[in-house]
Amino acid sequence: MSLTYKPKMQHEDMQDLSSQIRFVAAEGKIWLGEQRMLVMQLSTLASFRREIISLIGVERAKGFFLRLGYQSGLMDAELARKLRPAMREEEVFLAGPQLYALKGMVKVRLLTMDIAIRDGRFNVEAEWIDSFEVDICRTELGLMNEPVCWTVLGYASGYGSAFMGRRIIFQETSCRGCGDDKCLIVGKTAEEWGDVSSFEAYFKSDPIVDERYELQTQVANLRNRLKQYDGQYYGIGHSPAYKRICETIDKAARGRVSVLLLGETGVGKEVIARSVHLRSERAEQPFVAVNCAAIPPDLIESELFGVDKGAYTGAVNARAGRFERANGGTIFLDEVIELTPRAQATLLRVLQEGELERVGGDRTRKVDVRLITATNENLEEAVKMGRFRADLFFRLNVFPVHIPPLRERVEDIPLLVEHFLRRHHKEYGKKTLGLSDRAMEACLHYQWPGNIRELENALERGVILTESNESINVESLFPGLATATEGDRLSSEGRLEEESGDSWFRQIIDQGVSLEDLEAGLMRTAMDRCGQNISQAARLLGLTRPAMAYRLKKLDPSLSVKAMGR
């Protein structure tokens, strides 16, 4: 299906776009959909542009602003598709020029537009009126020797590419910023342009930045290798709470003292246990992790301490237990409170004497193992209730370490998000744009009762539900969570007005609008928005086509359904 531009086809109503803007002054935030926005003086942007040009030169500055605009265009194309699902896909493209204007970037006057998504055809010509970048140059920086609308040009290329699903390139053929009468642009597929290698080079990361990043990456990798070799790997985090954990581990790691890790479920106790092992002199020896709650009570002794042949039915071969396999290294017993009384007694002997006997055997075996245990329950209460041996508790509780929950490590969430997204992108063979700003804010404010494990699961769900090159939204992470934010919004006249759940209804009543007039207005607006297509307008209002046609005929009895078209 193709679309050739005609003036009457331009989608004039942008209420669906402007309604996405929220000014939440109480929080100091402005939102466009799920992306956080800023209002900034043009003179500030002019100073920024001047500094960038003086710092890296005109050519590199041009590439920088083109890439900046390109990223913004990608996000706005995603927003346009979400807000206009009932319209023909080609007509959704017109949301791009409206978002240009809504952001104060430029007014767009489309001259020609011929789009065929299935055929990969894209030809657009337009005039840009009052570009903010032209104003910057004409009033602050002076005229230049080439077109200056770099950010807007990058935006158009990013928006067009995301919309078409293929590489679209816009070029500015004339520009008021270099003395021309008008700002004119032409957009075509990369193939139609021919050799555009010199222009496409602007969209590649700057070599200086790449080289610096590559060096930083190499240094970081070397540091990580040194840390792992020296046993200083702790996982992910830089919050004060996490740094305190690392300092505590440092003090205990080099000895052989028993460490008891305390904390809620999902806080990363096994990661901390591995950190203790890697930091110790036993780093080159085995690290064996056991979840005591996952082993049936009647098998826990044989699993931990081994079994001799014939000890019980089915024991046809002798088998070493986890303690013997960890000899010389470290064993980590998670959910240690789940040990049976007999297993607790055997564990106490191992700690006191450094020896054990396999189940069904009579031979004493020496073991040299460092013990790290963990629980999310209160062991002292378990001792009082008779569930856990007091003498064993005192042996385990020599060096207790409390691991804080994720809600007390909010600063670590962005790092953890980046880590888990990288992992799941690789696992599912896709690359999203990461979390939307609102989704990240939701993560920072959520209490995370399941801690890091719950965060990882939520991010995995987000990656699964989100298409490549789209942002992960709040709904994908937290199904059913309300995302609406009360605040001030833009009215149709461009003024800020307070909005809450029922403010729109109050406004209708205050203006004396009748139910009949309201229905008629909804019908007309839906039809205008959908290019007089009854089926699309019906979907927009949640009606069937016959119901929509009936209401339209009721609104205008002289109108025949056949004359109304589709």
Curated annotation (Swiss-Prot):
* Cross-referenced InterPro entries: AAA+_ATPase, Homeodomain-like_sf, HTH_Fis, NO_sig/Golgi_transp_ligand-bd, P-loop_NTPase, Sigma_54_int, Sigma_54_int_dom_ATP-bd_1, Sigma_54_int_dom_ATP-bd_2
Among Gene3D superfamilies, the record links this protein to:
1.10.8.60, Homeodomain-like, P-loop containing nucleotide triphosphate hydrolases, Trafficking protein particle complex subunit 3
Q: Which residues bind DNA?
A: 534-553
Q: What keywords are annotated for this sequence in UniProt? A: Activator, Aromatic hydrocarbons catabolism, ATP-binding, DNA-binding, Nucleotide-binding, Plasmid, Transcription, Transcription regulation, Two-component regulatory system
Q: Name one GO biological process term.
A: regulation of DNA-templated transcription
- Is the keyword DNA-binding assigned to this protein? yes
Record's superkingdom? Bacteria
Q: Outline the extent of the Sigma-54 factor interaction domain.
A: 235-464
Q: Which residues bind ATP?
A: 263-270, 326-335
**Molecular function terms from GO:** ATP binding; ATP hydrolysis activity; sequence-specific DNA binding
Q: What does this protein do?
A: Regulatory protein of the TOL plasmid xyl operons. In the presence of m-xylene or m-methylbenzyl alcohol XylR activates both the xylCMABN operon and the regulatory gene xylS; xylS itself activates the xylXYZLTEGFJQKIH operon. XylR interacts with sigma-54.
Q: Which protein, by its recorded name, is this?
A: Transcriptional regulatory protein XylR
